[in-house]
């Protein structure tokens, strides 16, 4: 079964750290939505979308990528890193339009210095850590 993870990691590299850890242990292709906005997903059986959470949403590049490039009727898994809380609503709205089946979701804390968090030196320092990466690897292996 061919798997890909389409990701965006634009501020502190939290999501990239997580998906690269997954790729070291699992057979998945990594696609950077910012650098490869036109990547073809047709040959993949299972597709993951991974992003930090920005204003309670996946990064705009992920939302645009899914809207434009995701073929209908695919098995999907979702991964997010966050300072506050996980939120999958906006990406799930796009996936619903594409008749996709979400087979799993994984989220973990990620270092965040946005807005008021910057005043206190950020939150979730050191995350994702080795335990977070191990849990993400186990999540993908279990799909």
Roles of regions detected by a PLM:
Residues 3-4, 10, 16, 24-29, ...:
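FMN-binding flavodoxin-like domain, especially the glycine-rich phosphate-binding loop
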Residues 27-38:
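A short beta-strand-loop structural module common to alpha/beta enzyme folds
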